[in-house]
Amino acid sequence: MRKLFYMGLESYEARYTLQLQEWNERVFKLRGIDYEVINGLELDDSKAIVTGSVLDAHGRTYYSLSQHMNLIQKMKNGEVTSDDVIFYEDMFTPGLEWLPYIMDQSPAEYRPKVFLRFLAQTTDPDDFLIREGMFDWMRKYEEMVDQFVDGIMVASEEFVAHLRIAGFKKPIYVTGLPYGKSEVLERVTPTVALHNRTKRVGFASRWDDEKQPHFYMDLAEAYYKVDPEMEFAIFCGHPELKSNRQEYVDRALALQAGNTANFKVYTGLKKNDYYNLLADSQVLFNCALQDWVSNTVSEADTMGCLTLFPAYRSFPEVFANNANHMYVPWSVEDAIDKLKKMQFAIDNVYLDEYNIGKISDYQDGTIGRTIDCMLNGEDSRGHTDYRKYVAKAKYE
């Protein structure tokens, strides 16, 4: 690889994309990669998600199209060659169809390799685009992309199967989910031992259908009968709690105001505010139907929190099959039992079995593994034997 052209995502305060480019650039520099970031234009400087829930629908499209304008100019100038690689941080990058259109009509020496990261989309039945009615056209888009890219990066072994049974043909590589642990620790360094922290369980996912808000609120009410001092919190980057269904917001605010749960909604959190809350919390909880690895688990682990997630889809892999981090989906009773066990371990300062720090260490290696896949084809999963890797622990 002569040069890497990096097609990143626009920055949002409430999303991991705020830091994603810096995480990548740090590893590129460490590895001695000759790279160029292809930037786009932003609609405004709010760094806010207004239309949609994952990324802003207008902002995402505007940024991506302007990114492509800049890359097209470089290709027109002959600055991008067959010895180069273009890497897209997200498969859905509006305007991507121009790439095969130009390359198929260009001399072979001006056809770079193209790799991208596939995060979810139509192969996940619980992805937001399914509930928004985007399946039919998005699947056709994905099939188009699968015709011309050189490789697809995914976060977990479990997701490989979803792509293969959907008919994807191109090489698939398992890398983990990109994360920059050192950058996060530079923002906030946890100093308070777990047993001295606020008795708090946090929830850091979107407050939307696919994250099952009602399950979390059911748990909060049930655990109030076990330990009324344990706070159940929502960590939200928006100025007000936002959801695709108002009923989730209404119930959360009612719980906060009522006396059936110790419930608190934190809103308007900047990234460092969120990290400081994690650094003073004991547990991060997840009950998502749709989550492939999740940056929240890496962030919580970095901040010294215990993490309790469902034994579902990619999470056994995320935790290297450590049952202490997982509960039976979707059992409130089992989640309560696991929380009680965590509380006992915290109170007695016996935490070795939770492997704190190792979870985020593995994801911290994702960007390096992505480079290795592009350079050497490492961690490729074939068409017939991809399931043999599923039960193997990624770390010890």
Where is each model-derived feature located?
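A charged, aromatic-enriched C-terminal amphipathic alpha-helix characteristic of glycosyltransferases
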Residues: 330-333, 337, 341-396
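Aromatic "clamp/platform" in nucleotide-sugar-dependent glycosyltransferases that forms part
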Residues: 288-290
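Glycosyltransferase donor-sugar binding loop
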Residues: 230-249, 267
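Donor nucleotide-sugar binding/catalytic pocket of nucleotide-sugar-dependent glycosyltransferases
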Residues: 147-191, 196
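Membrane-proximal helix-turn-helix segments that form the acceptor-binding/catalytic region
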Residues: 131-152
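N-terminal pre-catalytic "stem/leader" segment of glycosyltransferase-like enzymes
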Residues: 1-98
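Nucleotide-activated donor-binding/catalytic signature segment of Leloir-type glycosyltransferases, i.e.
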Residues: 246-269
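Conserved donor-binding/catalytic core segment of Leloir-type glycosyltransferases
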Residues: 190-224, 232-233
